[in-house]
Amino acid sequence: MAKHLYKTPIPSTRKGTVDRQVKSNPRNNLIHGRHRCGKGRNSRGIITARHRGGGHKRLYRKIDFRRNQKDISGRIVTIEYDPNRNAYICLIHYGDGEKRYILHPRGAIIGDTIVSGTKVPISMGNALPLTDMPLGTAMHNIEITRGRGGQLARAAGAVAKLIAKEGKSATLRLPSGEVRLVSQNCLATVGQVGNVGVNQKSLGRAGSKCWLGKRPVVRGVVMNPVDHPHGGGEGKAPIGRKKPTTPWGYPALGRRTRKRKKYSDSFILRRRK
């Protein structure tokens, strides 16, 4: 990501960065409004996801995660910002007149050609089944169920690696470190998701984070005892427990939260780190 550092004496933007290489005007037929209700609340109005709320209004971009335009080459026309994800998206014009958005592969530029299908070249941005990919291929936007669309490795900078094939299954190493079995009939896109340096972006001020819909985070140790198990005490007091806990008293920092006896346990060869 080509970052531009603000040169201004104003404290709020002195260390802020912005990327000026992306287009931000989406196509009208590929967007639609989406009602964002709750802002972290459930149907009863109770907070179930903390630190969410506010934020700028967004239009949802329809992303083609299925890549079902078989054997029809497309050309990258624009690279655009998407407020609904940390990865960039690019507009593809296919040879039959179809126009779709896909996740921007790292290194792809305007004018590049991509294609999806079987027996297509192993090049950046092409989508093909795992059975046609050689071992060691880097990929993203991986399907778990054939025809359902990519569900794995879709965040900015995410990349998975094909490490083995046996029978009808392929073994993948995911960005989290998890080693998992996936059917070889599932589609995946070659390459890494773009916008790798998103974690190096400096917002510059608290208001910029509010625009993203992220509310302030308060430490439990500075709360009152009625609000958090870590709260209370005189002055700067410790948490008063052997181990840190969540606001509801459950163990924090290391406790496994995955549901036991899940149907996909047999497909996971090694848990994520």
Swiss-Prot record:
Spans annotated as Disordered: 1-27, 225-273
InterPro entries linked to this entry: NA-bd_OB-fold, Rib_uL2_dom2, Ribosomal_uL2, Ribosomal_uL2_bac/org-type, Ribosomal_uL2_C, Ribosomal_uL2_CS, Ribosomal_uL2_dom3, Ribosomal_uL2_RNA-bd_dom
Gene Ontology molecular function, alphabetical: rRNA binding; structural constituent of ribosome; transferase activity
Record GO biological process: mitochondrial translation
Keywords: Chloroplast, Plastid, Ribonucleoprotein, Ribosomal protein
Hydrolase found in the keyword field: no
Cellular location(s): Plastid, Chloroplast
A matching Pfam family: Ribosomal_L2_C
Subcellular location, principal: plastid
Cellular component aspect of the GO annotation: chloroplast; mitochondrial large ribosomal subunit
PANTHER family found in the cross-reference section: LARGE RIBOSOMAL SUBUNIT PROTEIN UL2CZ_UL2CY (PTHR13691:SF57), RIBOSOMAL PROTEIN L2 (PTHR13691)
Protein family per UniProt: Belongs to the universal ribosomal protein uL2 family.
Subunit comment: Part of the 50S ribosomal subunit.
Protein name per UniProt: Large ribosomal subunit protein uL2cz/uL2cy
Taxonomic source organism: Hordeum vulgare (Barley)
